[in-house]
């Protein structure tokens, strides 16, 4: 009996959600008709707005709205990109001392899609060196793409491969992450998928390697539009993603986690002082 009552209600909820999504899509197309320039994938259209104007009614309905992030970096640019007309910005001091989250810049190659076929060897040597220096800890290897992860993994020596869990496209991400968390051995997980939103405190991961600076993919039409629309958006977004990666280890004031960066493109980030907080700059060894 209850199933018969609940079923139409559930269907109404689903239908209401579809209607809301359709209305949002029509609003986006009215404001940004160029979004339809992106060809459909498997018969499905993906609409990615380059403004937040469609959400302004949500912002305007609030007397005060608190936006919290460790990677705002440049509040003026953040407000411009997200169409925030009036704001107050408060920066709180970092709670974790620099010595507990050191960054080691060990350039092996300038990494981009065009150089993938020739940088796998140098990057693999860098990974091997780090794992020898950290024989008793678990760690992360941020690859940014499945392609680069596979190439670097293939170039590793057999002894190093025994300590590396490779995240391949199509694998169950949750199961892989759970297996990594539960294992006691000093293994490392190589993946493009754990750069943000994951927590690796204390012995869950004491170290990490960044193979490639996480530049947005210029093959994506939306990325190109955003880059053309906002002069500093491309480097700004890259820096935000990079510092999110950096924050995966060392998660408390009594924790410790070090970071090794192998991509020479790191120099493009650190030379712009608006893109690197002083607290991070102080951690570079």
Over which residues does each language-model region extend?
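A contiguous, basic/glycine-rich beta-loop/short-helix subdomain that forms a polymer-engagement track
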Residues: 4-105, 110, 173, 188-192
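Short, low-complexity, polybasic intrinsically disordered segments
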Residues: 8-16, 152, 267-285
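Short secondary-structure boundary/capping segments
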Residues: 39, 79-86, 155-159, 204-207, ...
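Conserved interdomain hinge at the start of the Helicase C-terminal
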Residues: 56-61, 105-144
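Conserved RecA-like ASCE P-loop NTPase motor core of nucleic-acid helicases/translocases
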Residues: 66-68, 137-148, 261-262
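Phosphate- and divalent-cation-binding pockets in alpha/beta enzyme and binding domains
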Residues: 75-77, 148-152, 196-199, 270
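Conserved helicase motor "Helicase C" RecA-like lobe of SF1/SF2 P-loop NTPases
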Residues: 142-169
